[in-house]
Amino acid sequence: MCGIVGAIAGRDVVPVLIEGLKRLEYRGYDSSGIAVLDGTQVRRVRRTGRVAEMAQAAQAEQFGATLGIGHTRWATHGGVTEANAHPHISAGVALVHNGIIENHEEQREKLRALGYTFESQTDTEVIAHLIHHHLADAGDLLSALQRTVKELTGAYALAVMSQAEQERFVCARMGCPLLIGVGEGENFVASDVSAIVQATRQVIFLEEGDTAELRRDGVRVFDASDAAVERPLHLSDVSLASLELGPFRHFMQKEIHEQPRALADTIEAAIDAKGFPASLFGPTADAVLRDIEGVQILACGTSYYAGLTARYWIEAIAGLPCSVEIASEYRYRAAYANPKHLIVTISQSGETLDTMEALKYAKSLGHLHTLSICNVPESAIPRASELVCYTRAGAEIGVASTKAFTTQLAVLFQLTMVLGKLQGRISDSEEADYLEQLRFLPGSVQHALNLEPQIMAWAERFSPKENALFLGRGLHYPIALEGALKLKEISYIHAEAYPAGELKHGPLALVDATMPVVVIAPNDRLLEKVKSNMQEVRARGGELFVFADQDSHFSESDGVHVIRTPRHAGVLSPVIHTIPVQLLAYHTALARGTDVDKPRNLAKSVTVE
């Protein structure tokens, strides 16, 4: 949510800022703006709507500057107006901010008493005025920023410049992601590396409470006590090619089709090892996982559904109790802590605020062992975890998660294998069988992708609908949940998912001739139960759209449409059945003309409550 980019260089930074903001669009936003130091004057342009509209306005201004900051805003405090858009300015101090300041009202009253007036409804303008206020005593911008952040309660990432200081700008981080890009004779700040990858791949990840000063010739970082510190320099593996569409219409479509490669990369270490060593999860994983007596998974959204799927695997295969909770609920309840249970957090970005706070809460309760599953190296959640396993999905730009979800499933399956071996529940021959299933997974996903033309025909039937129902059982109920979420996220069709056995306990009242019902029907031990549930739908006039394995022996009839997925893939079947529900959501949204990659009101990285 929201995005920051800043630059100081020996060249015009306006194109860098604009390009960076365009690459941050996927995070979700409703307005944007830049501020630059043009001579000795701070000049600013802001617009609601797309970055492209703001860029046109900036071009008309004919800015020329070697120092500037930019922002994409997701409205929290105050509506979607130009006055509320960033950057905010206080007498020559310009600032952009991600996050939420919880004590902004208290600070606002103090500032009003000092004679400051406010032009916006935002909490951000409070910070700009505070920095300006402290400049008088502190004497320089960095010291003023360091004094200011000590008065703030909440989460923030900040980039600040002043017309009085033409050779540097400053930044700060607490609870929201922020990194520094290190170039040659130029340096940058950004919410994520995609914003600056066109300029540099060398990055410094700021820690909680850090402040920093950026000049053309160098960077200085200070910790929460204002002591100078050295933070390691990393080489990002994000490439420009991964941020381009190539032959695809949308990033979501591209990322759906990248799943065979992403899965192959994610399982490569296990394939190379010819098994499932604990070292897949870090050098100390064997000692940590050997004594685990249970698993608790904390996640949000799509990652939560990955966790629900893993619960079936962990309990059935590894023989360990497993609970799965929505992170935003867990962090506010009086939870019971068992130090022998492993806390697993799942987050594509590694910066999801509720998941991060849930992890902190679990530790405070006495949980000793933590594992994070994440797609972004060196992000906050992995850094706060004892063990880490990175999915190798690559950059995911579309707001609706696709390849991150299936690679999370692949990692969770490998975790199940490791735990099962350590529990003595998986023999050598069973391990070899599971490894063979995993080896065939990318190919099976490719076969599922080949169903796209058939699914496109279904999408035309779905596009005029306003409601849809998804049904699944057992391992495939979370996939029904994921299918419903994808459809509602990007097509704006109201969709719900239920365990098929719950139909008669309420949802059946919704079924009529106008209600499409999507059924996940693999050829497993619950198939006959699913068929009975389907008969309940047909008896009420509901129209069935069935994703069935090739060996499920379904036939089409009036009101029953069937697409045959690859042969039943055993315990990895949920990964295969994810592909058609992703494609159905994508092509339905396409038929309805929605903004597939940037659906309304949603953000890719949710870094506020």
Swiss-Prot record:
Enzyme class: transferase
Keyword annotations: Aminotransferase, Cytoplasm, Glutamine amidotransferase, Repeat, Transferase
GO MF term set: carbohydrate derivative binding; glutamine-fructose-6-phosphate transaminase (isomerizing) activity
Catalytic activity reported: D-fructose 6-phosphate + L-glutamine = D-glucosamine 6-phosphate + L-glutamate
The enzyme's E.C. designation: 2.6.1.16
Active site: C2 (nucleophile), K604 (for fru-6p isomerization activity)
GO annotations of cellular component type: cytosol
Domain Glutamine amidotransferase type-2: 2-217
Major place of residence: cytoplasm
Top-rank taxon, per record: Bacteria
Record Pfam families: GATase_6, SIS
Domain SIS: 284-425, 458-599
Subcellular location: Cytoplasm
Subunit structure: Homodimer.
PANTHER family: GLUCOSAMINE--FRUCTOSE-6-PHOSPHATE AMINOTRANSFERASE, ISOMERIZING, GLUTAMINE--FRUCTOSE-6-PHOSPHATE TRANSAMINASE (ISOMERIZING)
Task performed by this protein: Catalyzes the first step in hexosamine metabolism, converting fructose-6P into glucosamine-6P using glutamine as a nitrogen source.
Listed name of the protein: Glutamine--fructose-6-phosphate aminotransferase [isomerizing]
Lineage, opening ranks: Bacteria, Pseudomonadati, Pseudomonadota, Gammaproteobacteria, Lysobacterales
Gene that specifies this protein: glmS
